[in-house]
Amino acid sequence: MYIVFEGIDGAGKSTQINLLKDWLDQNGFDVETVVEPTDSEVGKLIRKILQRPDATTDRIQKTLGLLFAADRMLIMDKLNDDSKVILSDRSFISSLAYQEPAEWIEQINKYAKEPDLVLLLDVDVKTSVNRCSKEDEFENEEFLSKVKANYLDLISNFNHEIIDASTGVNKVSTDIKKAVAPYMGICPDCIR
């Protein structure tokens, strides 16, 4: 099972992945987590470029699109391991939301694995910016607003659940468990 967490920066993806992993571990599932960008040399280069002041320019976004596609190919074996539950912090869907043009992004990611379930953690842009520390903030409010709109347009193309990530950590975690439970053979009504 390949479950992807998507959403703008500051939506709480990392926190919720860790909470879901713990819960799935407790329920006897073999769980592995992945993060995009990865810790590979390509991933490190992506992180470095994201720190640049011009990171949201068209030219840099196209460069990042190529680098993300390359970085993704490095983890394909892990994503294709059907013996485990894979929880991913982002996927090619992030590239579709963040970079353009969409047709080109789709083409360079045509070999990317499609998730079994996408959990879109939805949070307003102001909350996102407030949650991000200055050194972690890659995008401005205008750019994040555009990305959020892109996510909401794209999400219907995938098996998905939209989770209100503006509520408290525990409420978001419970909502995620209820969304994931049926895929894992767990009764969603038993989750509190």
Curated annotation (Swiss-Prot):
<dbReference type="GO" id="GO:0006227">
    <property type="term" value="P:dUDP biosynthetic process"/>
</dbReference>
<dbReference type="GO" id="GO:0005737">
    <property type="term" value="C:cytoplasm"/>
</dbReference>
<dbReference type="GO" id="GO:0005524">
    <property type="term" value="F:ATP binding"/>
</dbReference>
<dbReference type="GO" id="GO:0006235">
    <property type="term" value="P:dTTP biosynthetic process"/>
</dbReference>
<keyword id="KW-0418">Kinase</keyword>
<keyword id="KW-0808">Transferase</keyword>
<dbReference type="Pfam" id="PF02223">
    <property type="entry name" value="Thymidylate_kin"/>
</dbReference>
<protein>
    <recommendedName>
        <fullName>Probable thymidylate kinase</fullName>
        <ecNumber>2.7.4.9</ecNumber>
    </recommendedName>
</protein>
<keyword id="KW-0545">Nucleotide biosynthesis</keyword>
<comment type="similarity">
    <text>Belongs to the thymidylate kinase family.</text>
</comment>
<dbReference type="InterPro" id="IPR018095">
    <property type="entry name" value="Thymidylate_kin_CS"/>
</dbReference>
<dbReference type="GO" id="GO:0006233">
    <property type="term" value="P:dTDP biosynthetic process"/>
</dbReference>
<dbReference type="InterPro" id="IPR039430">
    <property type="entry name" value="Thymidylate_kin-like_dom"/>
</dbReference>
<feature type="binding site">
    <location>
        <begin position="7"/>
        <end position="14"/>
    </location>
    <ligand>
        <name>ATP</name>
    </ligand>
</feature>
<dbReference type="InterPro" id="IPR018094">
    <property type="entry name" value="Thymidylate_kinase"/>
</dbReference>
<dbReference type="InterPro" id="IPR027417">
    <property type="entry name" value="P-loop_NTPase"/>
</dbReference>
<keyword id="KW-0547">Nucleotide-binding</keyword>
<dbReference type="GO" id="GO:0004798">
    <property type="term" value="F:dTMP kinase activity"/>
</dbReference>
<keyword id="KW-0067">ATP-binding</keyword>
